[in-house]
UniProtKB/Swiss-Prot annotation:
PROSITE patterns with a match to the protein in the record: CADHERIN_1 (PS00232), CADHERIN_2 (PS50268)
CDD domains: Cadherin_repeat
Source organism: Homo sapiens (Human)
Protein name per UniProt: Cadherin-20
Domain of life (superkingdom): Eukaryota
Domain Cadherin: 61-165, 166-274, 275-389, 390-494, 494-610
Membrane topology, as annotated: Single-pass type I membrane protein
SUPFAM superfamilies recorded: Cadherin-like (SSF49313)
Propeptide segment residues: 35-59
Domains (record comment): Three calcium ions are usually bound at the interface of each cadherin domain and rigidify the connections, imparting a strong curvature to the full-length ectodomain.
Cytoplasmic side: 641-801
Protein task: Cadherins are calcium-dependent cell adhesion proteins. They preferentially interact with themselves in a homophilic manner in connecting cells; cadherins may thus contribute to the sorting of heterogeneous cell types.
Signal peptide positions (record): 1-34
Pfam families: CADH_Y-type_LIR (PF01049), Cadherin (PF00028)
Length: 801
């Protein structure tokens, strides 16, 4: 079998023998390049090892690779090649079939001739080759004439894809002033065509837009600077268009483009410059510290860190009065007040301000000094200022006994303005609520207005105001601290009430009490007190005093033999004097009780005379008190009497309590031995049931008990017992005032267990039913009316109740 078409012989052709065994491998050196079928004999000669004159033996398939150009656009199916079997004699007895990748969809075969055609457009970039299988069958029997074999159809590339920049558009940055040839960015284009076949995938780069500033390497796609000293301040953004063309850039090649946006980054190549060489500013003399006077600005064409500025005052007479700082957001210099200004002292200042870049690049220092200076003139404007006190604080000491109206200090203030307005003085009354002082409105003399007492207020802190007469809104103030000095105006005295005791068996010279004193004064040299007996007790025979020279004194007995019966209490007057000028003194009394003591001096009992306070009540008050007590007693007795004679309630409140209704009780008792059943009567009147009161005679109806006995048969003891039981229960019901006044039918399903009395239903009368008479039921009242009608005599009309 031989193949014809667009094919080339590989180095090794595989020949498969019939019945699935190999004939071997054949080395072929001849390549079939023709697009037309090769004559059978010529191809067979190529496939044979023997001389052509020899008779060739039967061989299997003869294969090669088929090559088909992609992107066929014709209307007819594309001819690929031809398959032929040695057993095909051209009579149509052989049928060729095709299977494998794309068989019947992409490729078809003429089953008679073996011609292969492509029926779909082929794209090498989607699929480069197809592997198919071919077989020759007997058309009549369908039996394989030769074993199935594989062959390959390769898609031959054409230049149908242009280069593409997969990462575009590009963004790049390069510093300004960069040297020529500085690398900016590398761009890369890819071509989907076969790089191993021709020049379809060979890409060449060129620049379409961006010259003369940039260039591109035709092979690598690296973009570089092509112009020196490119200045960002002149032009910052560049748009460069790069082209990639296949076929090595030859005519007819396909091309693709991309855009590269290049930005020149800033460098510090521009020094700062002040647009103004002179600034004129003004400030009020009352401007507070750190207040803004004005702003200066040095322009720098750079940006970012390269445009940062630092402003300083390098010269001028205002360096000590003003300061300058840099605003980091706007890079301006802010001039502020450094110390208080005074129009009267200095009316103008001159500053020399420098602005410089703190970040420099050495390679650009030759472009000039990266600093500049300007001159600032500042004028101080006059304002109407409040009066100023000199000094700014007053401290005054004054004795507490100073006379009212005494001048203790002269307060002085002046108007700092050129006009020097007149001033009026006053005291801020919120600082002197007690109004102890006042000030002369014209002279500023501070005087006392009330007596001073150091023991009450030892310090006074007041505020004196000074006001311009022409402009009352201009007010100055000064604090004045006044210390009140002490004078000896308080006599010493005992700090508390002293009460001592002396034993009856005390001896002469025995200590019974130590006393001390206090003085509200505060002399500079400290307090010193002197103790002695008062003049009226100077010759006291019982007690004496000894000064300890430490502001205390001892009280001693002068004799022994004290007796409670003779005198139980002694009052000893003591004179206390201070050391001030003038000397002040006071008399304090020491109370001494006489007590019984044991031998060791421990007090056992003190029984001084009872001092009763005189209590005297008038006769009218005493009578009023007794009258109130009597009225209260009468009221109590009256209340008790009324509670004792409270009216008792009636037995029957009203006729409505007697019910004539029929009430049904679905209560089923437990017989005679059911002691836990509830009592209806107790539920009707719980108070009577709880009290356990004896039944009272009903007022509405009394049963005739005596008449019952004549109707009860006496022939049987059992009947007599039952009769007595029924009569007793009937009597209890009639005597119960709170029992329901109506009859009811009770059904008892449970009659108890083992009752010795037996069931009432088993009772039998000694006589027959005809002999029994129930006429007595008519005498039992309304309760037994129904029974009387059922069992009573039928003769005569029924009784009426």
């Amino acid at each position: 079998m031989w193949t014809s078409g667009r094919m080339s012989n590989a180095k090794n052709w595989l020949g498969l023998g019939m019945s699935l065994y190999f004939w071997g491998l054949m080395d072929l050196t001849t390549t079939v390049l023709s697009d037309t079928p090769t004559p059978q004999g010529e191809l067979e000669a190529l496939l044979s090892d023997k001389p052509q004159s020899h008779q060739r033996t039967k061989r299997s398939w003869v294969w090669n690779q088929f090559f088909v150009l992609e992107e066929y656009t014709g209307t007819d199916p594309l001819y690929v090649g031809k398959l032929h079997s040695d057993m095909d004699r051209g009579d149509g007895s052989i049928k060729y079939i095709l299977s494998g990748e794309g068989a019947g969809i992409v490729f078809t075969i003429d089953d008679t001739t073996g011609d292969i055609h492509a029926i779909q457009r082929l794209d090498r970039e989607e699929r480069a080759q197809y592997t198919l299988r071919a077989q020759a069958l007997d058309r009549r029997t369908g039996r394989p004439m030769e074993p199935e074999s594989e062959f390959i159809i390769k898609i031959q590339d054409i230049n149908d894809n242009e280069p593409k920049f997969l990462d575009g558009p590009y963004v790049a940055t390069v510093p300004e002033m960069s040297p020529v040839g500085t690398s900016v960015i590398q761009v890369t284009a890819t071509d989907a065509d076969d790089p191993t076949y021709g020049n379809s995938a060979r890409v060449v780069y060129s620049i379409l837009q961006g010259q003369p500033y940039f260039s591109v390497d035709s092979k690598t796609g690296v973009i570089r600077t092509a112009l020196m000293n490119m200045d960002r301040e002149a032009k910052e953004y560049y748009e460069v268009i790069i082209q990639a063309k296949d076929m090595g850039g030859q005519l007819g090649g396909l091309a693709g483009t991309t855009t590269v946006n290049i930005t020149l980054s800033d460098v510090n190549d521009n020094p700062p410059r002040f647009p103004q060489k002179h600034y004129q500013m003004s400030v009020l003399e009352s401007a507070p510290i750190s207040s803004t006077v004005g702003r200066v600005f040095a322009k720098d064409l750079d940006e970012g860190i390269n445009a940062e500025m630092k402003y300083t005052i390098v010269d001028g007479d205002g360096a000590d009065a003003f300061d300058i700082s840099t605003d980091p957001n706007f890079q301006v210099g802010i001039i502020t007040v450094k110390k208080p200004l005074s129009f009267e002292s200095k009316k103008s200042y001159t500053l020399k301000v420098e602005g410089a870049n703190p970040h420099l690049e050495m390679r650009f220092l030759n472009l000039g000094p990266f600093q500049d200076t300007t001159t600032v003139h500042i004028s101080v404007e006059d304002v109407d200022e409040p009066p100023v006190f000199e000094p700014g604080f007053y401290f005054v000491e004054v004795p507490e006994d100073v006379a009212i109206g005494t001048t203790i200090q002269i307060i002085s203030a002046k108007d700092p303005d050129v006009t020097n307005n007149s001033i009026r003085y006053s005291i801020d009354r919120s600082s002197d609520p007690g109004r102890f002082f006042y000030v002369d409105i014209t002279t500023g003399a501070l005087m006392t207005a009330r007596p001073l007492d150091r023991e009450e207020f030892s310090w006074h802190n007041i505020t004196v105001l000074a006001m311009e007469m022409n402009n009352p809104s201009q007010v100055g103030s000064v604090p004045v601290t006044i210390k009140v000095l002490d004078v000896n105006d308080n006599a010493p005295e005992f700090p508390r009430f002293y009460e001592a005791f002396v034993c009856e068996n005390a001896k002469a010279g025995q200590l019974i009490q130590t006393v001390s004193a206090v003085d509200q004064d505060d002399p500079r040299n400290g307090q010193h007190f002197y103790y002695s007996l008062a003049p009226e007790a100077a010759n006291n025979p019982n007690f004496t005093i000894r000064d300890n020279q430490d502001n205390t004194a001892r009280i001693l007995t002068r004799r022994s033999g004290f007796r409670q019966q003779e005198q139980s209490v002694f009052h000893l007057p003591i004179l206390i004097a201070d050391s001030g000028q003038p000397v002040l003194s006071s008399t304090g009394t020491l109370t001494i009780q006489v007590c019984s003591c044991d031998d060791d001096g421990h007090v056992m009992s003190c029984s001084p005379e009872a001092y009763m306070l005189p209590v005297s009540l008038s006769r009218g008050a005493l009578i009023a008190i007794l009258a109130c007590i009597f009225v209260l007693l009468v009221l109590v007795l009256l209340i008790l009497s009324m509670r004792r004679h409270r009216k008792q309630p009636y037995i029957i409140d009203d006729e409505e309590n007697i019910h004539e209704n029929i009430v049904r009780y679905d209560d089923e008792g437990g017989g005679e031995e059911d002691t836990e059943a509830f009592d209806i009567a107790a539920m009707w009147n719980p108070r009577e049931a709880q009290a356990g009161a004896a039944p009272k005679t009903r007022q509405d109806m009394l049963p005739e008990i005596e008449s019952l006995s004549r109707y009860v048969p006496q022939t049987c003891a059992v009947n007599s017992t039952v009769h007595s039981y029924v009569l007793a229960k009937l009597y209890e019901a009639d005597m119960d005032l709170w029992a329901p006044p109506f009859d009811s039918l009770q059904t008892y399903m449970f009659e108890g267990d083992g009752s010795v009395a037996g069931s009432l239903s088993s009772l039998q009368s000694a006589t027959s039913d005809s002999e029994q008479s129930f006429d007595f039921l008519t005498d039992w009242g309304p309760r037994f009316r129904k029974l009387a009608e059922l069992y009573g005599a039928s003769e005569g009309p029924a009784p009426l109740w």
